[in-house]
């Protein structure tokens, strides 16, 4: 398929993902799940081994109220036809009030009920110089700091 049209900004996609955030923070698990595609190609990827391509597994959890994503300063979305994407630098809010800076990208497709998330990748940015040590720590239990330092 050759496309000659450029991607265009999409407030519909942006609003869909921001509504997904809102539903998560409100603890509305079923309603948030309604914005996730049931397409067999659906996959959600997170940090440290989170790779979910099973619909039942993805939808089985419940969202804790006041825990979830808060939009970053400039979420952006684009579309071309029935496919589009979204990127953001949101914060993950924890129920205890703490927060973590995240990065998120998502692919959405237009379905009968509207735009639905078919892929999302959410992760914590780790500086390159710390990445290898952290991966070793997670995989092998190696301390993040050398003994005696």
Residues of each region from the PLM?
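Short, low-complexity N-terminal intrinsically disordered segments enriched in polar/charged residues
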Residues: 1-38, 136-149
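Low-complexity, intrinsically disordered terminal/linker segments enriched in charged
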Residues: 111, 119-149
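Residue-level signal for well-ordered, solvent-exposed loop/turn and beta-edge residues enriched
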Residues: 50, 98, 114-116
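Short beta-strand segments enriched in hydrophobic/aromatic residues
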Residues: 36, 90-92, 121-124
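Surface-exposed, charged secondary-structure patches
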Residues: 5, 12, 43, 47, ...
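Outer-membrane beta-barrel domain signature
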Residues: 36, 44, 60, 128, ...
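A short, structured loop/turn motif at beta-sheet edges
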Residues: 77-84, 108-116
């Amino acid at each position: 398929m050759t496309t000659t049209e450029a991607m265009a900004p999409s407030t519909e996609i942006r609003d869909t993902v921001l509504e997904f955030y809102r539903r998560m923070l409100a603890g509305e698990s079923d309603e948030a799940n309604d914005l996730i595609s049931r397409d067999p190609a659906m996959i959600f990827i997170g940090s440290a081994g989170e790779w979910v391509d099973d619909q039942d597994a993805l939808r089985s959890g419940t969202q804790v109220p006041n825990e979830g994503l808060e939009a970053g300063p400039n979420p952006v979305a684009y579309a071309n036809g029935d496919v589009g994407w979204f990127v953001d630098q949101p914060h993950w809010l924890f129920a205890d009030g703490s927060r973590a800076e995240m990065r998120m990208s998502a692919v959405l497709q237009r379905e009968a009920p509207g735009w639905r998330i078919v892929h999302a990748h959410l992760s914590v940015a780790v500086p390159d110089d710390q990445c290898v040590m952290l991966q070793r720590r997670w995989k092998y239990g190696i301390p993040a700091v050398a003994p005696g330092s």
